[in-house]
Amino acid sequence: TDPPTLWLGHVGDSRCYRQRRGKLEQLTIDHSLVEEQLRAGQITLDQAAHSPMRNLITRAIGSQATVQPEIQSHRPQLNDVYMLASDGLTHEVTDEEIAEILTAIPKPQTVATLTKACEELITVANRNGGNDNITVLLVAVAPDASRA
């Protein structure tokens, strides 16, 4: 049988990350003016992080009559952890901090351990500034017992 496919639709600056075998990867690209400037080489990462325009979104639901989402497909693997998070979290918590927290989740992941990791991510975001709403969701890829 074909391996399962994870479909990801994205607009705006909320992000999806994947933690696979200890490596964190940002799967989405922010639809923001600052991200466009960064990709064009007009500003540095440090300038982007402190830009007063970092919340200027170029694509979002509700900003126009229609919006074209970015659609991606991924092949999830056992023990992958996917994180969906608002900019309130990703602007306050570094990728290194995210990776450290996600790597520390014991395997096999459970609802309790994923909930604890979400709480820890929110605590770190609040400790680091927490000036915006903070939303985070973790999804772990578990073995499919029906295929065992």
What residues fall within each predicted segment?
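Conserved catalytic micro-motifs used in adenylation/nucleotidyl-transfer and phosphoryl/amide-
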Residues: 1-19, 26
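Short acidic, glycine/serine/threonine-rich loops at helix termini
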Residues: 4-5, 20-21, 39, 94-97, ...
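A generic hydrophobic-helix recognition signal that picks specific residues
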Residues: 5-6, 34, 80, 126
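ATP/adenylate-binding site constellation spanning eukaryotic-like Ser/Thr protein kinases
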Residues: 11, 21, 30, 86, ...
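Short, surface-exposed beta-strand-loop junctions and turns on beta-sheet-rich folds
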Residues: 14-16, 24-25, 33, 90
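Conserved, helical-rich catalytic subdomain that frames metal- and/or nucleotide-binding sites
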Residues: 29-78, 147
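C-terminal catalytic subdomain
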Residues: 59-85, 89-148
